[in-house]
Amino acid sequence: MSNERPYRLTLLGVAYRSAYEGQAPIELERLARTARRAGCVLPYTVAEGARLTVDVLPALYALADGAEELTAEERAGRALDFHVTMAAAVAEVLGILSVRTGLRTVALAGGVFQNALLLEELLPRIGDHHVLLPHRIPPNDGGIAYGQVAVALARMRCS
């Protein structure tokens, strides 16, 4: 057994241990909403090929740089920067895919889009697209379960 201390991973002091699913992103969004400055886009890259690859590691390094010494206000600003950066990256990928496919409609689904701040930052960046958002069915695993039930019912009716 090693005497080494376990590596602790946390982003800006948020949710070292999560008590429930989604706790860390909820806390990060809450922290970002207390920022007293505009957010800025941190460095990231999108590599084009058969697949698009988004590398946000440079942004994570920027967020972590000197994080131990940050004031609460500075942590809030960096949390906002994270959201702005993720929105910029999603918008860039959407733009590339739109050019490749000619599609102008996008469905924003999945638990990540329960983050209202991410949506607020993303929607203005993709304003020329027709955006579909879930309203009656949750965008997270509950929506997936609903879809699975719908498929099962359809298959039962066809058999």
Question: What positions do the PLM features span?
Answer:
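Short, glycine-/Ser/Thr-/acidic-enriched flexible segments
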Residues: 17, 113-114, 136-138, 151
